[in-house]
Amino acid sequence: MKIIYLHHSGFIVELERMTLIFDAITNIPPHFLRKGRKNYFFVTHSHQDHFSQKILSYGSDYDTTYIFSDDIPEKGGRDIHYIAPYQKISFPGIEIETFGSTDLGVSFFVQAEGKNIFHSGDLNWWDWDTASHPNINPEVEERDFKALIQKIEEQIGKHKMDVAFVPVDSRLGGSAYRAAEYFIDKLHPRVLIPMHFWEDFSVIRTLADRETGSGTEIPLFEDRNVVVGNY
């Protein structure tokens, strides 16, 4: 399983027989997509930092299936599937289950080729500074995030996650790491890859240093369109 970082919350997971693409908003270098195999495009929600209509153009050159959160306005064309939180959909060799978000749309749990993959979308502990976000209630944000993690733990906790993509948003200041650290503490993924950090790659090393000894690997990377690791 090869993991490629695209940008922001965009990743490619390349398996032996299929490729999974999550929240791609930038042009994908052509050498990262392969013909002669199935390419599944996942979009967690309609925010412009997670969804770009550009991904629909790949259907003309590649064998593609699209799995969109149902808050995205319906697009014409076949092989586009819309899904709400807490639903399941399957295709040959791949099982997909959705969970909720603390913002908009869904988070994805994908099982394929013996691998368990979780993409959080905007499922995050949004602990904003109330001075800059006076309408935010930190206690409510904490409660909602922890409740969703508990639901995930109850429903799929028996499946060890091979990789989880979780927001580490530096705009939250010192609270940027709360979601990832809580996720590791409760769900124990083998690998956790930070996302949603815009261009602030420094948060990756900081999280890795903070989670030394946790048993979860946090790979380091410092650029777009790079291979993060092989697992």
Residue ranges and their predicted role:
Residues 135-144, 163-185:
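Active-site-proximal segments of metal-dependent phosphoesterases and phosphodiesterases across multiple
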Residues 1-36, 79-160, 223-231:
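Core dinuclear metal-dependent hydrolase active-site scaffold
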Residues 27-30, 46-51, 72-76, 89, ...:
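Active-site environment of divalent metal-dependent phosphoester hydrolases
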Residues 18, 61-65, 187-191:
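A short helix->loop->beta-strand "cap" motif at the edges of active sites that frequently abuts
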Residues 33-35, 53-56, 79, 131-132, ...:
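Short amphipathic alpha-helical segments
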Residues 20-22, 42, 67, 117-120, ...:
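Structural motif
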Residues 1-8, 77-89, 102, 150, ...:
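Binuclear metal-ion centers of metallo-dependent hydrolases, dominated by the metallo-beta-lactamase
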Residues 26-72, 153-165:
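Active-site metal-binding motif and surrounding structural segment of the metallo-beta-lactamase
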